[in-house]
C-alpha cells in the first residue's frame, strides 16, 4: 500500500467515518507509526488533532469486537508517541495535562475492568495491558502535582483491588499500580488482601498471575520493613507474620486446588525472598498446632519438595535435619510415599550426585513401589523412576568426568560410583523377585516396566542400539541387566493371563541382540517346541503365549540360521491343516484337543513382521504357503458357519456333537466349547486373512488380482452380514476396516475403486427380505461403517450418499404384510446403521453435518406404529444426542450449568433447520396434549434435547438472543400437563431459557398466584423451581446468594399454607419439602430472619405431619404419595432435630426418634435408621433407652428385610449387659439365623451383631461363651475368604471389631481357646483385596497395637510380631498354622497336591484368585514366620512332597522355560514343599540336583 496515500487519508479528520471500522483504525495507527517526531511537538499536532476522535472511540459502546481491539492498538501507539514527545519537551507535557480530561484518564485506567474479554477474539488482554502500562507511564510523566498524582493513583488502586482478578490483565494492572503507590496502600484499602487472594488460587489457570500479584505486594512490603530496621531476623519474622499463618492454614486444609496453586507458584517465590525464610517456614510447619505428626511430616515433605524444586535447598540431610523423611515411606497414604521417593531421588540439577544416605534410604524402602495399586499413582511412579535413572546416569557421568581432574578426591568419587552400581544390582534383584509365579499383577507390571526403562539407558552391552534412548552422555560403566534367570522368568511370563504383561515381556526380550542365557541352537529349538505345545492350548492367553514364544525364536533363529522362519512356518502350517481335518470329523473334539486359534495367531505374527528380504530367498515356497492359508480361511469358514450363523449361536449344538465319550469328561458344556472354538477361530482367521491380503500384494502381485481382492472383500462382508454372534462379527469389523483402508490407499486405480461398489451392495443387502432385524441388525451396520471409516480421502462423499440413502430407506412406508411382526424390516436396518455411523468416533467430524435430518427421522420414529421401529428410533436418538452434545449424562441429570456446554444459540446456528422443525413438532405435540391429554411420543425427545442445552449468554454489547421466544410458552404449557413425566422433562427444558442472574426474580414470579391453581400446575411450578435451582444455584455470586436469601424465603413463606394445605397432593408437598431441604434448611445464618422463619415453619410442619395423626387425611384416595412425603418430612426432621429441639415441646429426642422407628411406613423407618447410621454420634444415639427399645422391636422376622438388617447392625453398637437381655435373641438363635436361608443382608447384620453379643456373653455365661465362640469363629472363617463378596467380608471384619480385640486381649480366658484365630483373621483382612477393608482392619490393628497410623504393610509387619509373640507357643495355634500351610483345596498330602497341579486342566477358564493384592508366596512366607521348629507335622508333609518331586520329575529330560515347573500351580506347590522343608531343616540336595539336571525353575536350582 502507498504510504503517502495512507497519510493523506488518515491526516484528514473529515475522512474518518462517524462509526470507525477496523480499517480506519489500522490506517490511523500506521499514520502514527510513520509520522515524524516534530508532528507531535506542535500544539495543533497529531496529539491534539486526534484526541477527541480517540476519546469518543474509546467510549463508543457500539463498536464491534475487532474494531474495539484495533482502537486499543491505535491508542497504544498514540500514547507511546505522546510519551516520547513529552520527555523531549516539558511544554508538551503541560499541554497534554491541560488537554486530557480526568474522565479520559479514568477510562484508560478502568480498561482492565471493562475490557477483560470480547467474544470470539483473542489478544484482547494483551492490548488492554499495553494501553494501561503506557497510560500509567504518561500519567506519571505529565502530572504536575505529587498530591494529585498520589490521590489519583491511590484511588485507581482502590478500585483495582475490587476488580475480578480472574483475568491476567487485572493482576498486571494491580502490580503496576502497587509499584508506584507502595504495598502499605494495599493493606490499608483491603486488610484481608492476602486471604482473598489465596482463595483465588483455586483456579489453577490464573494461579500464576495471582501469585505474581501477591508476591509483588509482599516483596515491596519486605523492602519497606528492611528500610525500617537492619535486623534481618526481625524483618523476616515480621514479614512472615503477614502471610505465614494463612499459608499454613491452607496448607493443612482440605482445598487441594488452592494448595496446588500455592505450591506451584506462590510458596517457591516466597521462600526465595530471603535465605532464612525456608528454615523458619519448615519450623512453623512442624510446630503447627492441632494436627497429627503424620500430617505435619507430610506438610514438611511437601514444603521440602517445593524448596528443592526451586533450588532453595540443594541436598537433603537424611541423617539429622531431614531424618523424618525416611519415616514417611511408612505413611498410610501411598501418595506421600511416592512424594518421599521423588524428593530423594529427583533433583532439578540432574547431574547432582546422590549421597550414600540417599542410596541407603532408597534401597531399604524401594519395596513400596511394588505395592502401588492406583493406576494414576503407578504412572507417576514409572515416570519418576525414569527421571531417577536419568539423574543417576547424569550424576555418574559427572562423577567420572570429575575423577579425571587432577585435584579430585578419586577415592570418594569412586566409592560413589561403586555405590551406584550396587544400588542398581540390588534394584534388579528386587525386580527379579517380583516376577516369580503367583506374584500379583501390579508387582509384575511395575517390575517389568522398571526393567524396560532401565535397559533403554544403555547399561547392558547386549541391548540393540535401536532400543537405547538418545542421550548426550552414557553411564561410565556397564552391567548385565537381563541374565539367564531373568530371561527365563520373562519367557515364562509370555503366557501370562494379562495382555500388557505378555507384550512387555516380548518387547524387553526383543530389545537384545541375542536372547540372554539362551544362545545355542538347541535352546532355540527347545523353546520352539514348547511354543508349539502351547499353540494347541484351549485358553486364549496360553495360545498367544505360544505364538509369542515362536515369534521370539524366529527373531533370533533367523539371525543364526537363515531360513529358519520358513521352516518353522511350514511346521505350523502342517499342524494347522491337521487340526482342520480333525474339525471336519468333529467340531467338539477339535475344540477340546485340536483348536485352531493358536496357529492362526502365530501365522499372523509371522506375516506381520515378514520382511521382503526373507521372502526373496525362497519366493516360491512363501507364495505356496500364502495361497494355502488363504484357501484354509475359506475352509475354516465352512466348518464354523453353521454355528455362528445360527439365530441362537450361544446354545446351538450341531447334530451328533453331543454324543460320545468325550462329552462325559468335559468341564464346560459342549455348546460353549464349540461356540468359543468357532468365534475365536473366525477372529484369528479374519486377522490372518487381512494381513495376508495387505502384506502380500506387493510380494506376489501376480496372485492378488483385483478379482481376487474383490472376492475376499466380499467374503469378509458375508461374515458381517450372516454371523449372529456379536463377539465374532465385532472381531471382523477392525479387520475389514484395515483391509478397506489398504485398498483405498493403493496406487492402482482398479484396486482403490473396489470398496465403492461394496458400499452400494451393502445398501442393497439392507433392503433384502432375508436379513433379520434381531440383534440390532447384527454386523450389517458395521459392514457399511467400516467402508466409511476406511475411505479417508473419500469420506465426505461416501457419507453423504450413504446417509441420504439410509434416511430414504428408513422413511419408506412399511408394507402392510410386515405389520404382523415380520423380522425383515429394511427401515430398522437403516436406523441401526445410522446409529453405528453416528456412534463411530472416527466419523464424528463428518457425520455431524447430517445430524439434522437424522434427528428429524428419529423423532418421527418415536410415533411409529411398529415397536421395532420405535425401539431403534430411541437408540438412534440417543446416539445422535451424544454426538451433538458430547459425553453421556447420567439418568435424570439436570442441566447443571456447565459453562462449556452447547448453548441454544450455538446449537441452532450449527443446526438451523432444526429450529423450525422442532417448533412445528412441539406445537403439534402441545396441541395434542391440550386437546386429549395424550402427548405425541415425539414430545419426549424434543424436550430431552432442550434439557441438554445451555442458556445463550450475551457478551459485551450483544443483545439477548430471542430465538427461543416461540418455544417458551409451549414448554411452559408442558409444565402444567396432566402427565407427570411431561411435567418433569419440561421443567428441565426451561433451564435453557433462563439467565442465571435472573434466577431469583424468576422463582419469585413462579411462586406468585399459587392460590387457585390446579394440582398439576402446582407440581409443575415446583418441578421448575427445583430444576432452576439445581442448574443455577451453584453459579450464583456471593452478592446474588445474599439477595436470594433475602427475597426468596419470604416468597415461600407467603405461599407456605397453599403448598401444605390438605387440598395439595402429597407428591407436590414432597417436592416442596425437597426444595426447602436442599436449599434452605442447611443455611443457619442467624442474621437472615426470613430464612430462619421459613426453617421454623418447615420444621413445625414436618413434626406435625409425622407425630400428629390428625394432620394426616384418612381418605385412601387422598393418601397417594403419602409415604414418600412422610419420608422427606422425616429426613428434614431428623437432620435438624438437634438444632430445633427447643421447639419439640416436652418430648425428648429419644422419644421422637423412637416414634419414627415405630412409624407405619417402612420408608420413614428406613430414613430414620439411615440417619442414625450416618450420624457421627451413632453410638450415643443407639444407647438411648427409648431408641434401643424401638430398634429391638424392628428385629423380628415379620419386619421388612431392609429395615431389619439396618436395625440389627445398629444394635451391635449398643450392646451392654442391659441391652443384651432386652434383645431377647440368644447367640444360638443368631447362629441359626446366619446358617439359615435368610437373605444375605440379614445374615451379615447378624454376623456383626454376634460379635457384640459374644463380647457381652463372656461376662455373663462363660460356658455358653465358649460354645458360641467356636461357632462364631467357624462363621467368620466361612465369610472371610477371598471368594466371598465384599459385604460379607466386611461384615466378618466388623464383627471382630465389635468384639474388640483391644479389650479382650487382656483377659486371661481369652488365651484358653481359639482366640488366636481372630488375630489370624484380622491379619487376613490386613491383606484383603479391597482397600477399604484393609484400611478398616489397619485402624483397629494400630489401636490394639497402640501405635500411630502407618501404611498397611508396616501395620501388618507389627501385627505379625504381636501375633507370634502372643500365641506362638500355643499348641493349638501351631496346629492352625500347620493346617493353613499344608491344606490346599481340601487336600492335605503334598504328593496329591503336586499331582493335581501337574494334571492339565482343559477348561476354557481357570479359577482365578480374587485377591490380587496378596500373593500365594507372600502368604506362605508369612505363615512360615509363625510356624514353630521342630514341627513333625510339617516335616512329614515336606518329606512326602520331596519324594513326590523326585518321582514325578525323574524321567523328565529337560523342563526349561514354559515347562511344568514354570506353571504357576506347579511352581507354587514345589516352592511350598521346598520352603517348608527348609523351615524344618530337611536336606534338599537331591531336589536341587534334579532341578539343575532338568533345567527347572531358577528358584529351585542351586
UniProtKB/Swiss-Prot annotation:
GO BP terms: tRNA methylation; tRNA nucleoside ribose methylation
GO molecular function: enzyme regulator activity
Originating species: Schizosaccharomyces pombe (strain 972 / ATCC 24843)
Localization terms from the record: Cytoplasm; Nucleus
Gene: trm732
Official protein name in the record: tRNA (32-2'-O)-methyltransferase regulator trm732
Domain of life: Eukaryota
GO cellular component, one term: nucleus
A Pfam cross-reference name: DUF2428
Protein task: Together with methyltransferase trm7, methylates the 2'-O-ribose of nucleotides at position 32 of the anticodon loop of substrate tRNAs.
Disruption phenotype: Loss of methylation of the 2'-O-ribose of cytidine at position 32 of tRNA(Phe). Increases occurrence of 1-methylguanosine residue at position 37 in the tRNA anticodon loop of tRNA(Phe) and decreases occurrence of wybutosine at this position.
Keyword Nucleus appears in the UniProt entry: yes
Disulfide bond annotation, renumbered to this chain: none
Keywords noted in UniProt: Cytoplasm, Nucleus, tRNA processing
Family: Belongs to the THADA family.
Primary localisation category: cytoplasm
SUPFAM superfamilies with a match to the protein in the record: ARM repeat
